[in-house]
Each structure stands twice: as C-alpha cells, then as structure tokens.
C-alpha cells in the first residue's frame, strides 16, 4: 500500500546521510471525511527510503508525516530488498511487518499494507519462536524470523524481526513498526536493530535523534550515530532517564498562565515518537480541555480555530527547564476546517500520573536519545 509518494530529492552535507520526504493526503483527513475517525481513535489508542548518502558514522534518514502528526520512513528487508513504510517508535522495541500470509481474525487478508514475501528472499530464515501482542480491543500474533534489513545505507544482516501472521488493525497508512526502545521491553525477545548495529560498531556514538518538521510535506529526519547541530537552536539540555532501559524522563510540572495544572508533585513522561498526541491521566486531560475551551465530540476535543490567538502556551517543565508549547503548535486543523486538541486520555493507564509526549511536543523540540549515557537531550527545533 502506497499512501505516500517520496520525492527523489537528496541533500548532502559533511558526515550526513539525508533522505528527504514528502507528505500527501493524510489518514486523519481521509477518516474524517468518511466519518470513521472516532471509531479509529476508540479502537486504536496508542500502543503503539529512497535515496541515501553516507559519510563518516552519522546516518540521517528521512521521515514522512502522515495522519497530520505521524511520521514514517522506508526500510527494506530481504534479498532482493522489499520496501516497507514503518513508524520509528521510541515506545517499543520490535521490528514488526506483516507476512504475505497475514490474516485478520475474520480470516480475511490483513490491511492493505505491503507484506513481506519470505519465499522471494534468499537470505531469509525461519525460527520456531513465536510472539503475541495484546492492544486495545485486538491482538497481534507472529513468529520471529531473520533477514537482511537496511535503513538507508545502514545494513543489519541476519536481523531478527517479527513477522505478523494475525492482526486486527484497521486499514493503516503504514506497513509496520521499527522499535527504538531498549531490549528489555521487546515482545518478541529479538535484539532490536539499533542494538545489533551498535554492537557491530556501525555507530561512532550510540545515539539517535529526531527532527520532526512542522511542514506538511518534507524535511523530517531520524539520524543515527550522531547529531546534526543545524536542526536545533541553542544548547541541548540533557535529562537522565528515570529507569535506564526505557525512554521515560521526570516531568516536574505542567503549567498554564504560570499556574500548575498537572504533575504538581512531579511525574514521569515517556518520550514517544510513535504517537501523534500528548497523552495523560483522564482527570488532568479533562481539566486541560476546560482550560482551553475544548468541547468533546465522541473521542475528540474540538476548539474554535479563532481561539489560537487568545489561548496561552502550555509549559512542560523538565529537569528544571521550561518547554512551552504554544497554541499554534497544539491546535491542529483537519480537512473539515475544525481545530482539535491533541491532549488525549492515556487509555493504557487512564488513572496514573504518567504521560506520553508525542509528536505535538517533538515537532517543537529536537530530541536526542543517548543509549551510552541513558539520557535524552532536548533543544528548540529550527
């Protein structure tokens, strides 16, 4: 399935591999037009190249923006290579793509994604290891296989990955997920691709970073093995992880108009590139919606688009540093001309004071994930 078209534009600079991207019609707009968006949000809450140049040990890989705030990039699997559009997700650890034999629970073929044709790859090998992942109202089942995986010019031979043979997702505008979290949360038990490449000496530094462009068409990248300083302003502020082994950091408080509205005693936040929204506990999210004048329609909250000039910034204080997100960043207009709030209930844990800072936050702030020092760096994106 090809929801997006890549423009073959390539930018090169010293010590960089860069693959530019483009966004076309988004999934959110498509579902809104068909009046299917509320059903999608209810059933699928978060659980969740191309041309490449490489110099030195820094690889910059392009991402495309879909569903207004979801970013995907291309990888290939197999010999000869088969191409897949995947979400680069810091909230999970596994590389997952559908098998050519994948079925839905009703025995119909899986969603219209591209599917891996294992019989066409000369480097593919099976294992007897299986896995099952539960999410929301459905499940995903598969087995662990091995094959050659390429991210731009990065090559991982005999890479273990999850090959899905049963899934209950609605049609989705991407093929799979490439997890970038620590190995300990892997569902399949396979070594994540970043760890395997790191162990093989593919990177001069065990880091990766995200620049998520606000532009609707192109410019977003994920970079491996280093940081391109042209993508942010000022200095990186480093935040130690709460629990080494997961990309969660301490959140001091959340405030609006200099008044604390959440996390008054501190809480924690997962920095999650695999979700478009900012997710938090139900009571706090509902309080934020009241502060910004949002009205609920099923599972979404809408705000008058004209309010963007009157609403205050929402400030996330992390490790003593304020990270404001202005209304121009947290209000998003859909295809119907309505503006919606990105603050949503974390349905996986609706009562706990745990947050997920998704792409609404990360479009504003360049992020560096440092595996060598168990920390995350944040700076204002250009």
UniProtKB/Swiss-Prot annotation:
The keyword Glycoprotein applies. Residues 16-53 form a propeptide. SUPFAM superfamilies: Acid proteases (SSF50630). Disulfide bonds join 102-110, 263-267, 305-339. One of its GO terms (molecular function) is aspartic-type endopeptidase activity. Residues 71-379 form the Peptidase A1 domain. GO terms for biological process: proteolysis. InterPro entries: Aspartic_peptidase_A1, Aspartic_peptidase_AS, Aspartic_peptidase_N, PEPTIDASE_A1, Peptidase_aspartic_dom_sf. GO terms for cellular component: extracellular region. The record marks 272 as: Ancestral active site. Residues 1-15 form the signal peptide. It is found in: Secreted, Extracellular space. Keywords: Disulfide bond, Glycoprotein, Secreted, Signal. Trophoblast and placental tissue. Produced specifically in the invasive binucleate cells of the placenta. Glycans are attached at residues 57, 74, 128. Has no proteolytic activity. This is Pregnancy-associated glycoprotein 1. It comes from Ovis aries. The lineage of its organism: Eukaryota, Metazoa, Chordata, Craniata, Vertebrata.
């Amino acid at each position: 399935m090809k929801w997006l078209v890549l423009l073959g534009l390539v930018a090169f600079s010293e010590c960089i591999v860069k693959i530019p991207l483009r966004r076309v019609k988004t999934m959110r707009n498509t579902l809104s037009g068909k009046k299917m968006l509320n059903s999608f949000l209810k059933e699928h809450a978060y659980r969740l190249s191309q041309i490449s140049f490489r110099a030195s040990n820094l690889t910059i890989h392009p991402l495309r923006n879909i569903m207004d705030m979801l970013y995907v990039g291309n990888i290939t699997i197999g010999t000869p290579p088969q191409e897949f559009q995947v979400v680069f997700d810091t909230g999970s650890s596994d590389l997952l793509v559908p098998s050519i034999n994948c079925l839905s629970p009703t025995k119909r073929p899986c969603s219209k994604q591209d599917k891996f044709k294992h019989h066409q790859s000369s480097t593919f090998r099976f294992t007897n290891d299986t896995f099952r992942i539960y999410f929301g109202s459905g499940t995903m089942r598969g087995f662990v296989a091995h094959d050659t995986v390429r991210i731009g010019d990065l090559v991982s031979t005999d890479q273990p990955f999850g090959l899905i043979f049963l899934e209950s997702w609605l049609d989705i505008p991407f093929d799979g997920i490439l997890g970038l979290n620590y190995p300990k949360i892997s569902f399949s038990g396979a070594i994540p691709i970043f760890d395997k490449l790191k162990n093989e000496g593919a990177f001069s530094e065990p880091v990766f970073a995200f620049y998520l462009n606000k532009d609707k068409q192109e410019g977003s990248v994920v970079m491996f093995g280093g940081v391109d300083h042209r993508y942010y302003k000022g200095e990186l502020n480093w935040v130690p992880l709460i629990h080494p082994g997961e990309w969660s950091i301490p959140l001091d408080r959340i405030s609006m108009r200099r008044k604390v509205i959440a996390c008054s005693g501190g809480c924690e936040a997962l920095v999650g590139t695999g979700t478009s929204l900012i997710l938090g506990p139900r009571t706090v999210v509902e309080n934020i919606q009241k502060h910004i004048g949002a009205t609920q329609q099923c599972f979404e909250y809408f705000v008058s688009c004209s309010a963007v000039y009157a609403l205050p910034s929402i400030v996330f204080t992390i490790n003593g540093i304020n990270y404001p997100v202005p209304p121009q960043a947290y209000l998003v207009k859909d295809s119907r001309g309505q503006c919606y709030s990105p603050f949503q209930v974390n349905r996986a844990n609706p009562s706990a004071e745990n947050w997920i800072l998704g792409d609404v936050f990360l479009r504003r702030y360049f992020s560096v994930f440092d595996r060598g020092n168990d920390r995350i760096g944040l700076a204002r994106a250009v």
